[in-house]
Amino acid sequence: MRLFLFCTALILVASSSVHATEALLFNGGGYTIQIMVGYEDDPVVAQVFFTPPGAKDWIVLPSEGLQIEKFDMEKRTLTMNFSNKNNPDLPRSFSLSVKKARAALSISGKEIKGEFNWDI
């Protein structure tokens, strides 16, 4: 199922004007966030996948709930917020802050420290 969702998302992104070709990864506290990077003139966040602790399948986060405040591949910084308006099929609202290889996920009143992989 995870592979199917991943392939479906890649097809959707590839058919748009932004082509996602690379992925960045957060791991911490059982949470995994995969960020697909697309390119127009500069790198952009094209799609985000989320897996909570104990889950087997990725959840594709809708772009209308995502706010990318900072994203700089050269400086290796990312600040991203996800807002959930009471959809039980999606994760709770969260924020992810990344500086180089260190990351912090704030969700459900907890701050979870983790690693961020910028290697593409």
Where are these regions (language model features)?
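Sec/Tat signal peptide C-region and signal peptidase I cleavage site
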Residues: 16-20
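Sec-dependent N-terminal signal peptides
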Residues: 4-14
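Central antiparallel beta-sheet cores of small beta-barrel/beta-sandwich binding domains
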Residues: 21-89, 94-120
